[in-house]
Amino acid sequence: MIAFLPKNHSLINKQETGQYIYIYSFLFDELFSIEIGNDTPVTLTWSKNDSSLYFACIKSSPKIDEDEWKDVIQYRENSLRQKAVIYQIHFNFNDRVLSTETNIIRNLSLLIGKLVYVSFSEKLIFSSVSQLIEDMNDFELYSIDLRNSTAEPSRLTYNEGLEFQLQVSNDGQYLLFRMLSLGSNKELFNHTQYRLYSLNLIDNKLTRLAEHFEGNINQYAMKSDSSIYILGQLGTEVHVYSQDLSMKDLVYHNGWNGTYELIACSRKNQSIAFVYSSFERSMEIYLINDITELKSAQSITDENQLITERNLPKIEVYSWKNDDDHRTIEGILHYPPEKFQSKNLPLLVFIHGGPYWASLNSLDLGWYQWTTLAASQGWLVLEPNYRGSTGYGDQFLNEIRYKPLSRPGKDILYGIDQLIKDGIVDRNRLAIGGYSYGGFLTNWLITQTKRFNAALSGAGVVDFTSAWATMDLPILLGYLFGELPWKIPHTYLNESPIYQLDRVCTPTHIVTGEKDVRVPAAQSYMLERGLHFRNIPVKLITFPKEGHSLRNNPWHGKIKVREELKWLQKYGNQSCTQHVESTRNHSIRQELTYYFLFLFFFIM
């Protein structure tokens, strides 16, 4: 059976306001719905023999002091009231009729991110989370002994990191998980690349796997024996590795260049399924009988045939140096079709988010990553893996700290300089854009140079002090800047574009989600107002009911890309200095108008 939690019940003909879990039975080829009340389910896990299901919910907040407070929200108090509850559902099928019995396992004072069942010791293990990511102590691992109904949860880790993708080893003695650390008060974890760990559930010993791997751990999968497959990123490539849990060394498995995105293994034999793509192959699912068949794998899906029939842009990896510290920076160049390695091309700098992520050799055609479409419109597209990107070692990644805009910004500007020196790019036809941290850097770079004819800012920040105070991830900014705003106000001021908008001349298109809590929409409104007051061409569009990711309405992503392409077409070939002259003339006319109005009222 398969159990799942839909985000939208209407997609499967459910209009009720209550919450449901859905069970698909392979035996009966039928989908069953189970009503679970009003508590919001967040994660679930099967018992050993699939006879029951454990799931965790966010418990509906009790209405305390409603007569006194009415509909008034007490901000932090309301957040602290949110608790979790774990349930167990027992299943019974009789004549294709599903009957269930639901019991409460635990009421918890924590919120739960992920839940897994350990048959070896009859325990549930869960990761704790918090809506406000202010303290890394809120994100740890706990266990619940199902054999003792009164026992309190036992804390397993003190990692001060974000643990996710929890899996239990086949023998039930180890818990594997990936972790992202943003520094540690105990100085245990100071790296910030994604890592893989194994927790011994008998003695609680924590072991880092793939310890000598210099890159980023993107995914992993348990094999049928005591070993794992790992998808590891080095530079712009993601390849397949394996490691025995009793060994330290990784084994590299020779496959195609590109990005292995997801991987799953059979626990009965050597079969492996994986998702793969590159700029030469569209994303599909592949199935092989053994890891030695990686290079001869055949896809079992054909969902992107239309894409393969197109004349796609060709790419190459491009390197340059930041002349300030001689650090080598790498990026991906997307050439327009039929113009591979041509010269004097218009350039669009397309900046990835994160910052702890990277542009990869993969074919992604969504609203967030539309470099292929931009190149097909005639642009040479540069995706720079600036300081802070994963896949280039911990030191490279951590060099973004203390100069979170200015240092990666210089990485990007030196890359543009080198492309111009090499004759690849026309210096008079430059544009820039990015989303999330890519929007942060876009906003910064248009204050540092007048060379860009057009800019595309998505979910970007212009004032990092107010962003720290209003976003749901203040710990990220505290880590990037090195301290809290009132302790180093000069750094927050110097790295915030809002205080340098007088230097901008680039026409800027801005997008934001109306309900974005990761990068609040107010930041985009601040940028729009500042540029409008300076008479710089600017347009802001907001997407209703959308958060940081535009996932609620597919039209929103399409409209975003459509309007950004229009902006590039309108302004991409016009020099920024034309707008400076236009702005100067407008200011002179405005001053003359005020002068004559003053004279008129003075004479009257």
For the regions a protein language model found, what residue spans apply to each?
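Beta-propeller and related beta-repeat scaffolds in trafficking/envelope systems
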Residues: 182-201, 206-221, 254, 258-261, ...
